[in-house]
Amino acid sequence: MPGRAASPAMSENEFDITNALFQNDSDSDNEAPAKQAKRQPKAAAPQQLDFLNGGGDDDDEDDEAFIAETQASANRKASNLKGRTVKKGGGFQAMGLNANLLKAITRKGFSVPTPIQRKTIPVIMEDQDVVGMARTGSGKTAAFVIPMIQKLKSHSTQVGARGLILSPSRELALQTLKVVKELGKGTDLKAVLLVGGDSLEEQFSMMAGNPDIVIATPGRFLHLKVEMNLDLSSIRYVVFDEADRLFEMGFAAQLTEILHGLPSTRQTLLFSATLPKSLVEFARAGLQEPTLVRLDTESKISPDLQNAFFSVKSGDKEGALMYILHNVIKMPTGPTEAAQRMKEENASGKSSKFSKKRKRSDDKAINFKESPTKHSTIIFAATKHHVDYLYSLLNEAGFATSYAYGSLDQTARKIQVHNFRTGISNILVVTDVAARGIDIPILANVINYDFPSQAKIFVHRVGRTARAGRTGWSYSLVRDSDAPYLLDLQLFLGRRLVLGREHGDQVNFAEDVVVGGFPRDGLSQSCEWVNKVLDDTVDIAAQRSVASKGEKLYLRTRNAASLESAKRSKEVVSSDNWTALHPLFNDETSQLEAEREKMLARIGGYRPNETIFEVNNRRSGKPENEEALTTIKRVRTTLDSKKKRAQEAKSEFVDDDVPTKSGDADADDAEDGAFSDEDEAGEGAADNMSLASESDLEVTFSSYNQPSNKKAKKEASATSFQNPEYFMSYTPNNTNMAEDRAYGVHSGTNANFAQASRDAAMDLLGDEGSRGFGEPRTMMRWDKRHKKYVSRQNDEDGSKGTRLVRGESGAKIAASFRSGRFDAWKKGKRLTRLPRVGEAETPGLGADLNHYRGGRRFKHNKEQAPKRADPLRGDYDKMKKKNEAAKERQLGKFGGAAAGGKSELKGTDDIRLARNLKQKRREKNARPSRKK
């Protein structure tokens, strides 16, 4: 009987059951009979199919059940198959990494790549330049370390570093070095750390030892590059970690100088939490056709996010914040459950006895994929002074609070963020600069205490909540001066603007921009509590004063809103619905509150028909000055008629002269003070443009350009040289400032870096001064001692009082970088030259020079002569004893033999002693001298 043909390969949606059907067939070409004999006893009884005696519907049902069971077993997860190692799809195994690196990744504890790792590692493996936007805690360090180790593989015997990682701070560089060592355990790659504060001589020895990977801060690496005249032509892999902080800390000149010395064939990676304009320009100049990698969750607002905007006065912001925390979020006061649990463990004595073991177990038990607490809230403030003030105020209210801002110490910031992520605190008060690098996977609420000046910043703030299919809330406090920015945001999001209860209960917080006020009673109680705290606590009152001064600088430097939104905001703020009760407070008591608010609004808006002079004269019953009363009535009548004519002219201008985009319905909405949805306006504009004729356009634009007064006619005649038929403006006619400042959320691809970077670019204002993010400080300052202006660059790079020299790129660098210490080090080590890039390395050169073996540094026992004793100093006796002790040890500096040496010259005493010893030896031996 001929052998049965092998079954075809399974398709994507099907599976093969022929092995179960023909498991007793020994003529199969795929398996040997011996193997089948071994597998035959393992066959399950239900898989025995009887085709002779069967039939009917029961067999069909059995077949369907069998196929379903087989399919379920094929789709079973690999974790359920005990005793088998199944390769998981979509993990690190599918990225083509070597076995040693996969073992190191598993040992590190990584099982599934994070979103930023899943997007960047395949692109980096294809040798493309990458600009990745990722926050701290999202796994970006492993995202560039894993491809680097995969590319470098092992230590190279040729001289020259091949990988360079630049970090903004010493702490981040140490953290990166730790990750490199852990992931590179299966290789012999050498990694060195070059940061400020360490000995230059030791770093000379490290660089002489031919490292493969250099992890450094820009200032110290540039110092070594200039001092040692390093050749960077061998570097293949360059990483700028947290590039926005690199530029913020003033390393732009150092980065430009370092970038100039790198080869053009390098692969450059740039990771940043945000993209300032200066960083985009740097990426365009230093990277070759880069790919922008950006997570969707960081560029779009989640559809599950619900937004609420509250109109408040400047003096009621603190009370409004307290009302939101107490009554809307219902934030609990006192220590959290995590803080109480930690306190109990510390009290029980476990922490003192098993401190290290407990710390490891707690870190493993914490699941950062889950929400720290169900009330976890981030509050965004404008400056660091606001952060300090709100932190003190919230602590006084009894909330568990953490804080962070840009100039906060790195260790303190890490502790504060760790407390928030682990649930020890419920509230985190931050600035935009400090929060751009903090990654909180799941967040419940976001509060904008100070409304952002750009729509991008709003998206960046609220993008931290409503992730992974969960719902989230954002609450924003909007003052009257913030209304233009709110309208810019409404245009940018393309959502309907709802003021108060003008649409009744038909509002959607996830799709509308809903604005309203707080209940008056609840807000007044919160404001009274805040005022009482300010009166009782002097420190908090002083912090509020400092915060108000910082707010003036912040308002002076924030971006201006669009002109159209500024005009619209006047009408919106003046409407009664601006301060109406917010639809979020929709219950029986809120209905009574709404009626009460209307009554108070009518009372507050009452304007009598008579002036105070007329009322007084009418009450007295003696019109003493009839002439004055007549004059007042005549003036009032004239003013009323002027107001009436102005309103009629305005209504005619809106109805006839101004061309609308979305037809008569939108024009009516504009008269009523409501603003239509941007999508509807876009559809109406498209319909109008498709039906409009040349004559209609000519009439429309000519009526729009007609001057309305003599001044306008004069200006029009001055610019009459512009022929509207041929004139081309340098700006498009449909320019929207809100969209130009922001980016399109629902459009755009990352294929073009110029377009993608323009969409993602965002500048943040500084949180402690008037200087904006990425803006250079004043280049000169007044030197009181020398009575002249000097460069501030000397203060920033540590070379104050010294001159500057030009580097290879033409940029000015500190002259102290060329101090000659490397030449003195080589002379002390008796080295004429070090191996150049491309030559074979000298075995053990770096280890012999600095006793650096196996990553351990051995302490030397060098002795030096003390300073000579000065009789005029107070420590003369002490130094004299030190000199006498040094002379006794016979150091060569004071004459005589060195310690442990032997003098070649013999004196009379030495000769006499030698003769006596020789005579004693003769007597001891008692042997006569030999005579020949």
UniProtKB/Swiss-Prot annotation:
The protein's matches in Gene3D superfamilies, at most eight in alphabetical order, are given as: P-loop containing nucleotide triphosphate hydrolases (3.40.50.300)
Specify the protein name.
ATP-dependent RNA helicase dbp10
InterPro entries membership: DBP10_C, DDX54/DBP10_DEAD-box_helicase, DEAD/DEAH_box_helicase_dom, DEAD_box_RNA_helicase, Helicase_ATP-bd, Helicase_C-like, P-loop_NTPase, RNA-helicase_DEAD-box_CS
Q: In what ranges is there compositional bias, type Basic residues?
A: 915-932
Name the Enzyme Commission number(s) assigned to this protein: 3.6.4.13
- The main location is nucleus
Residues binding ATP are 134-141
Quote the biased-composition stretches of kind Basic and acidic residues, using this chain's numbering: 639-653, 861-891, 903-913
Q: Which organism is it from?
A: Aspergillus niger (strain ATCC MYA-4892 / CBS 513.88 / FGSC A1513)
The record's family statement is: Belongs to the DEAD box helicase family. DDX54/DBP10 subfamily.
Which compartments does it reside in?
Nucleus, Nucleolus
Region (Disordered), start-end ranges? 1-62, 336-367, 639-719, 784-807, 835-932
- Compositionally biased residues, Polar residues: 700-709
Q: Provide the Helicase C-terminal domain boundaries.
A: 360-515
The job of this chain, per UniProt, is described as:
ATP-binding RNA helicase involved in the biogenesis of 60S ribosomal subunits and is required for the normal formation of 25S and 5.8S rRNAs.
Motif (Q motif) spans which residues?
90-118
Among CDD domains, the record links this protein to:
DEADc_DDX54, SF2_C_DEAD
PROSITE patterns referenced in this protein's UniProt entry, alphabetically: DEAD_ATP_HELICASE (PS00039), HELICASE_ATP_BIND_1 (PS51192), HELICASE_CTER (PS51194), Q_MOTIF (PS51195)
Q: Name one Pfam family in it.
A: DBP10CT
Catalyzed chemical reaction(s): ATP + H2O = ADP + phosphate + H(+)
Question: Can you quote a single GO CC term?
Answer: cytosol
